[in-house]
Amino acid sequence: MFSGSMVALITPLGEAGEVDYASLANLVEYHIAAGTDAIVAVGTSGESATLTVDEHVKVVLKTLEYAKGRIQVLAGTGANATHEAIIFSKLFSGTGVAGCLTVTPYYNKPTQEGLYQHYKAIAEATDLPQLLYNVPGRTAVDLLPETVARLAKFENIVGIKDATGDLSRVKKTRELCGEDFIQLSGDDATGLDFVAQGGHGVISVTANIAAADMATMFKLALSGQFEAAQKINARLMPLHRDLFVESNPIPVKWAAHQLGLIKHGYLRLPLTELSESAHPVVLQALKDANVLL
């Protein structure tokens, strides 16, 4: 259902802070041409936390419109209030969205039982396929494999994006949830190793600016050609590292602008533009990865 190189798509913004839909359309075409397996719109990299509800919905629907059925589009639907996450999931039902990526509630720090009840309520309220999203470095809660196993019993909870960087979880989650439960890495630096451990792919920040390389790398990996995949991964490692020199998506939006993929690299407060001292760091990473010659 979901596998390979899936991009955690950035949301282009204009000088006044408005969504730049022309650049968004360009990004969709870029990913289709590059062979990206799926687009995840309005997740962390898409600045979901600072878009209005209307903007959130419109960006997803416009991404679908631009894709024209040529690539899968998933919607970020996470919220730290369960009823809001349900509303988002229901809004995208019947639109053509392939599934939802739902981050664990942030700030309010629910228990494992609270996390279970949160996702249970969402699963029971919508028929869309749901991907759990565990990123404790941002949310301050960790969705444990045992809780994932309880949730995997719901037919429409089909997998997880795991951004813990803990490769031991791949095997444990597979043992608890079965081989058909989709496991996607949310950490570019360990994404290839994640697949080597039995994962199905990655939801990637790096793919925003190195889409063809990421798509090729994961096609090779999923066909068992890890040596060839590792050569690409080694070249991309400066990006995996330095696209996080400041908070994501600050560096990747700056890089995408430098590459001409988007018209501007603007963000919304409280995120600020990439500091000048970090410009040479990201620029060198682009050169080392052969993305910028």
From Swiss-Prot:
Compartments (UniProt record): Cytoplasm
Keywords: Amino-acid biosynthesis, Cytoplasm, Diaminopimelate biosynthesis, Lyase, Lysine biosynthesis, Schiff base
Residues that coordinate or bind pyruvate: S45, I203
PROSITE patterns given in the database record: DHDPS_2
Gene Ontology BP terms: diaminopimelate biosynthetic process; lysine biosynthetic process via diaminopimelate
Catalytic reaction annotation: L-aspartate 4-semialdehyde + pyruvate = (2S,4S)-4-hydroxy-2,3,4,5-tetrahydrodipicolinate + H2O + H(+)
Keyword rRNA-binding: no
Predominant subcellular localization, coarse grouping: cytoplasm
Listed Gene3D superfamilies: Aldolase class I
Family annotation (PANTHER family): 4-HYDROXY-2-OXOGLUTARATE ALDOLASE, MITOCHONDRIAL (PTHR12128:SF66), DIHYDRODIPICOLINATE SYNTHASE (PTHR12128)
Oligomeric and partner information: Homotetramer; dimer of dimers.
Family from the record: Belongs to the DapA family.
Annotated protein name in UniProt: 4-hydroxy-tetrahydrodipicolinate synthase
Organism: Photobacterium profundum (strain SS9)
Species lineage: Bacteria, Pseudomonadati, Pseudomonadota, Gammaproteobacteria, Vibrionales
